[in-house]
Amino acid sequence: MNLEKYILAVITTNPNKVSGGTASFICETKEEMEFVAGNLEAILDGIAHGLGEEMYVIVKH
């Protein structure tokens, strides 16, 4: 089995929305969350997707 799509990281302002399984980053503000998501997108060579107002996921396609 070859995984082609997977979640690299989760970035959120609401720690109650995250459980284990991948790298999680808890931010204090929406602006900080967007900044962290943008940087992780570049660092991890992934794509950031917003899931509502409180969460981004970085995925590898």
Predicted regions mapped to residue ranges:
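N-terminal non-globular leader segments, chiefly Sec-dependent signal peptides
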Residues: 1-46
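Short, compact, well-ordered microdomains
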Residues: 44-61
